[in-house]
Amino acid sequence: LGLLGLVGWIGDPVVFWRDLLDLLAEVSRQASGVDIEPLSWESLEPLAPIMAGIMASAVLVALSLALLLGTWWASGIHGGSFAAMFRNLHLGYVIGGLATIAGIAAILGLQPLAGNVLLVLGTGFAFQGLAVVYWWSWSKQWPRGWWLALYFPLFLGPAVRMSEMALLVTLGFIDNWYRLRPGREDMV
């Protein structure tokens, strides 16, 4: 909904982000010294069509992390188990249906809007995919420190990071429709 509001407010989002990224590239060129490579417009231009989705996803990540942190604090005060609640995270069929529609629309060429919506919904499924991994680690009693194998690749660069995020999104989406966690209680 916020993504649609942004599009309504700024008009054509591709033009808006293209102008903003062009300004960023120009500022980078002006600020660069001999030690740093300035940002090139060619590296930023492909981001313009999906920049609204990237920004909305970033806001969703920040809000989700704040919500998870607050839930963790509240569970510590009230004696609940945050880990159990997180392991049961499930977005539900409505969000799954919207993601399916956005995916079909993206395949049919309704870009960039469908791609941007898919980015935002994919962010939620990344959290659900992470919950699936934590559920597996808990149910299979993986050894301590297993999470290093999950989080270390995030520091290996953008290609590895995006591949891992795509895997988490896929895992979350599949779990949404076909329960990969038997006995899971639905918690949104």
Q: Where is each model-derived feature located?
A:
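Alpha-helical transmembrane segments of multi-pass integral membrane proteins
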Residues: 1-12, 51-67, 90-103
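Aromatic-anchored segments of alpha-helical transmembrane domains
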Residues: 2-4, 98-106, 151-159, 176
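Membrane-interface interhelical loops and short interface/amphipathic helices
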Residues: 4-51
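Membrane-water interface at transmembrane helix exits
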Residues: 70-78, 134, 138
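Long, positively charged, glycine-interspersed low-complexity recognition regions
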Residues: 111, 118-188
